[in-house]
Amino acid sequence: MSSDDRPVPAEPSPGPRSGSPGRHAHAGADQGGAIDWEVLAPFLERGAEIQTPLYEQAAAWLRALLSPDAAEGGAGGAPEAAAPGAASRAPTVRRILDVGSGPGVVSCLLARAFPDAEVCAVDATEALLVRARARADRLGLADRIHTHHAEVPHGLDSLGGADLIWSSKALHHVGDQRGAVAALAGHLRPGGLLAVCEGGLAPRFLPRDIGVGRPGLQARLDAAAEDWFAEMRAALPDATDTLEDWPAFLANAGLRTPRTRSFLLDLPAPLADDVRRYIQANLSRAVEEYGDQLDPGDLSTLTRLVDPHDPAGITRRPDAFLLSVQTVHTARAQEQ
C-alpha cells in the first residue's frame, strides 16, 4: 500500500477490516479490540459519501474504458480517449463485484453508473453489509444489489465471474497483495476489467501554519501514520515484503492494457459543518491510534483541534478544507 492510506483524517475505506482512524477503522480488528459497529458504521458511510464526487469521476472513467469504442492507450496517465459520446453510453456490463464494499456507498454508485448490471457487495463485516442492503433499498436499487459475506481473498470462490471488479483500500489488508490481485483477476469474465483503488496522496485539511503549536503538523502526522501502517502490514498473516507496484501486480495476474489515473476531491474552505465533524472524528481516532508517537506539543495541538469549544478547533476555524487524491489502477482480462 502507498502513503495515501495512512490513518490520518480523510476518507475511510470500509474494507474487510475496520477500526482505525483516517480512511480506515481497523484498530479493533487488527489488534483484538471489540468494534462498536453502531458507532463506527455511520462514520464509514459518511466518509464514503463525502468522497462521492471523486468516486463519480472514477466511475465515469471506468465506463469509458469499458466502452466498445474505447481507444487502446498507454498506462502512464495520458488521457485514454474513447470515441465521442462513449463515456455517456453504458457499456455492456452485466455483473460487478465491489470487493471490500463496506456500507455500500460505491456499490450503489456503480449500480447507477452501469444500469444494466447486477452488483455484488462483498465484505467481511456483516454489520456493514446490512447497511449496504438498507442503502440499496432506500435508493430503489435492492433488486440489483446483493451482498456476500466473505474475507479477501479467501471466501471468494463462490462469487462467480464479473465484467467489472472494483476494490478500494481493501487489498492492503491482505498479507500477500500480489496473490490477492491474482485471486480477483481469476473472477474476471473474458475482456472484464479489474479496478484497484490503492495509492494516491495523503489528504490535507489545514494550512501549514495553523497558528497553534509548531508549523507542519500534518507532515508529522503523516510520518506517524506511515509507521503505524508499516506495523499493521508487518503483522498481517502471510505478509510479504515486496515492492508495492500495483500495475505490476495486475500484469503478473495475466491482465493486459494496464492504466492508472488519479482523481481529486477538492472541498475548499469554508467547509460544511458535517465535513468538519467528520474530520474532527478522524483526528480523535488519530490521537487514539498513534498519539503516543507524537511529541507533547503536537499532542496538545491535536487536543485543541478536536475540542468543539476551542476557537482553534477544526469545527470552528474558517481555514479548514479537504483536499484528497485517490489513485485507481486498472487492467483487463484477455478476450476469448
Model-derived regions, located:
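A short glycine-rich, Lys/Arg-flanked "PGG" loop and its adjoining helix->strand segment in the class I
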Residues: G179-P190
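Class I SAM-dependent methyltransferase Rossmann-like catalytic core
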Residues: G32-E56
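Conserved catalytic/acceptor-binding region of the Class I
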Residues: V196-L271
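Conserved alpha-helix/loop element of class I SAM-dependent methyltransferases that forms part
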Residues: I50-T92
